[in-house]
Amino acid sequence: MELILGSQSSARANLLKEHGIKFEQKALYFDEESLKTTDPREFVYLACKGKLEKAKELLANNCAIVVADSVVSVGNRMQRKAKNKREALEFLKRQNGNEIEVLTCSALISPVLEWLDLSVFRARLKAFDCSEIEKYLESGLWQGSAGCVRLEDFHKPYIKSSSKNLSVGLGLNVEGLLGALKLGVKLSLL
């Protein structure tokens, strides 16, 4: 069965590659600006459901489609993708020395199965080095990442402690997805 990743995220693509999952990457357009909620959990769930509905339009007999959405929450205040450097700096100031939550809603749809999961990755951060913040902002790497969070590089040395489900923090619940894919294969054999 062909697997399609309905996302332009390189982090999600890398997670699938690291787990030996073969896939084709296709962008799905869903207007997240149409969502009016400020609750991080509700937002990420509704965004993922919206992408799942778009994925249903692409669904064919022999394919499965994976979609996901992530937001960052600091003190229950939602951080999406920063629109500019000023907003990116505000996000980083709020995260500095605090606990952050990366909320990721992952979903899979196939002819035999529909799976949806909302998981949270938590990390307690040390204080950021001011000169490193400036370099990070200048690099532009923060663009396109929810809350400007990049656990794979910028944020990595500042993690004091965290939950164990790093793939959720990187934008896709791979462990849950692998279970859903195995279940889908078993169901298709019935």
From Swiss-Prot:
Do the record's keywords include Cytoplasm? yes
Set out the biological process GO terms recorded for this chain's protein: nucleotide metabolic process
List the catalysed reactions. Answer: a ribonucleoside 5'-triphosphate + H2O = a ribonucleoside 5'-phosphate + diphosphate + H(+); a 2'-deoxyribonucleoside 5'-triphosphate + H2O = a 2'-deoxyribonucleoside 5'-phosphate + diphosphate + H(+)
Output the Gene Ontology cellular-component terms: cytoplasm
Q: Where in the cell is it found?
A: Cytoplasm
Name where it mostly resides.
cytoplasm
**Which family does the record assign?**
Belongs to the Maf family.
| Full protein name | Nucleoside triphosphate pyrophosphatase
Per the UniProt entry, what species is this protein from, by scientific name? Helicobacter pylori (strain J99 / ATCC 700824)
